[in-house]
Amino acid sequence: MNHTGIIRTATITGVAAALGLAAVVPALASPLSDPPAARSTDPVTTVADLDGDGEIETVTAQLTGENDQVVSATVHGTFISIHPGADSAVPLDAPRVADLDGDGRAELIVTRSVGANTTFFTALHYDGRNLGQVVDNDSKPLSVAEGGGVAAHLGYRCTPLDGGGRIFETVGADPITYSGTRTVHTLRDGALTTRKTIPITARPVTDPVLGTDAASCAQTGS
């Protein structure tokens, strides 16, 4: 199966350092305080057309241990699953159903870790036999951030292409100006390949290039 499309990402000098700011530690609870409730291990579900055949599959995510989750589905009678990891300190969200390249087959945007103001996601795809992680140009699992609070402006969006397909853009910036690079990739069989890198300098945060809209990446009909 070929998974093709154009992916556009943006990387920003200094954003990683901004995200490294320590969160304020809450005051210690008194000795008489009730202990925190255990995190739920109940499964969460969504629906997606993983192979683009018009049939809808139920996708389930469930915490299975310390910093581990399993994401699973059944496609044409075959059970498939993957363990992409998770932040077991917070409740688990159901995967977001996306179609990053507009080919009709779903990618799953899965939460990996949650900070005070920033959530980090990875992406999964169905290769015709099992679920796998979308990887970057270095064959490492894709990581996408959203949020950033006062330290950064982070997110992603998709834009339709003339003639079909989609552009997938990830955005990262400080809250005043946007400086860094925009990198154009193709997506094939769950792997990103860099095609072009475009430098960007001193864009204001109100510039449309910084617009983010996760819903614009949703799979049509999901």
Report residues per predicted region.
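Acidic, small-residue rich beta-repeat scaffolds with periodic aromatic anchors
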Residues: 2-10, 28-30, 34-44, 131-132, ...
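Terminal domain-start segments
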Residues: 2-92, 208-222
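Short consensus segments that form the blades of beta-propeller domains
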Residues: 36, 62-63, 112-115, 173-176
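Acidic/hydrophobic-patterned starts of short beta strands in beta-sheet-rich repeat architectures
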Residues: 52-61, 100-112, 161-169
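Structural motif
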Residues: 66-71, 116-122, 175-185
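Short loop/turn segments that connect beta-strands within beta-propeller blades
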Residues: 76-77, 127, 188
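Mid-chain, structured segments of secreted extracytoplasmic proteins
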Residues: 80-111
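Long, charged/polar, surface-exposed segments that mediate recognition or autoinhibition
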Residues: 99, 107-137
